[in-house]
Swiss-Prot record:
NADP(+) binds at V144, R145, S174, R175, R185, N215, P216, D217. It catalyses: 2 reduced [2Fe-2S]-[ferredoxin] + NADP(+) + H(+) = 2 oxidized [2Fe-2S]-[ferredoxin] + NADPH; reduced [flavodoxin] + NADP(+) = oxidized [flavodoxin] + NADPH + 2 H(+). GO terms for biological process: cellular response to oxidative stress; heme catabolic process. Its cofactor is FAD. It comes from Buchnera aphidicola subsp. Baizongia pistaciae (strain Bp). This is Flavodoxin/ferredoxin--NADP reductase.
């Protein structure tokens, strides 16, 4: 049975555009980078409001970090957003999910596509580093609406330095232009080949594995493009393929 345990709020980091990070400390069971858990807030009537969130922190780090967006009239996010370091919430003892690097076959290039808060699992994986040796190159792509939505911009650049030339990073911003990002949306930039040409690496079914995390529309459209245009298949334990995905709502 997966029980609820108490987590102490360490810090609520409030970013721009209603984005925030919840940092807690709790004696959870060991988890695998890329997994998610459930956070809960207990109401006065004893009922727990709960939602699933992926870990941003690596498994070896002391505190647990979760990245989310404040939802207007959202039952849980409005509670979490207004907590401070004297408060406590509930967290599941054990974690969930198979969106992890140990589930990905060895290949030449691993592509990590994320929109918005879907960047979280990749940060956990890359900080932990375990199983990254299975790939010659890793490409991390983070797509957002505005530059202020790139909450972990500095952390991503630090990871790029740690991995040296093994990690490629690319930011995509859809609603404003910058001198460091591509403009548009992931599916369209794949269709035009602008993304691959800009990075100078190419998605091929015999060399690449693609991970998709975030907006369900992005996941669906990108997955369909890869299946129809790159001759790729969904990756299943019983039937290996080249596409792994996780929807974020």
């Amino acid at each position: 049975m997966n029980t609820w345990i108490t987590a102490k709020i360490i810090k609520i980091k409030k970013w721009k555009n209603n984005l925030f990070s919840v940092i807690v400390n709790a004696p959870i069971s060991p988890f695998t980078a890329g997994q998610f858990t459930k956070l809960g807030y207990q109401k006065k009537n004893g009922k727990i409001i709960q939602r699933a969130y992926s870990f941003v922190n690596a498994p070896h780090e002391k505190n647990l970090e979760f990245y989310m967006v404040l939802i207007k009239n959202g039952q849980l996010t409005t509670k979490l957003y207004n907590l401070n370091n004297t408060d406590h919430i509930q967290i599941k003892k054990k974690s969930y999910g198979f969106f992890t690097l140990n589930e990905i076959p060895t290949c030449k290039i691993l592509w990590m596509f994320a929109t918005g808060t879907g960047i979280g699992p990749y940060l956990s994986m890359l900080k932990y580093q375990k199983n990254t040796e299975k790939f010659q190159k890793i490409v991390l792509i983070h797509a957002v609406r505005y530059r202020h939505d790139l909450t972990y911009f500095n952390e991503i650049n630090n990871l790029k330095n740690i991995y040296n030339k093994k990690l490629y990073t690319q930011f995509i911003i859809s609603r404003e232009k910058t001198n460091f990002s591509l403009s548009g949306r992931i599916p369209q930039l794949l269709k035009t080949e602008e993304l691959e040409k800009h990075i100078n690496l190419f998605i091929e079914n015999n060399t690449s594995h693609v991970m998709l995390c975030g907006n369900p529309d992005m996941v669906k459209q990108t997955q369909n493009f890869l299946i129809n245009n790159k001759n790729m298949k969904k990756h299943l334990r019983r039937k290996p393929g080249q596409i792994s995905s996780e929807n974020y709502w």
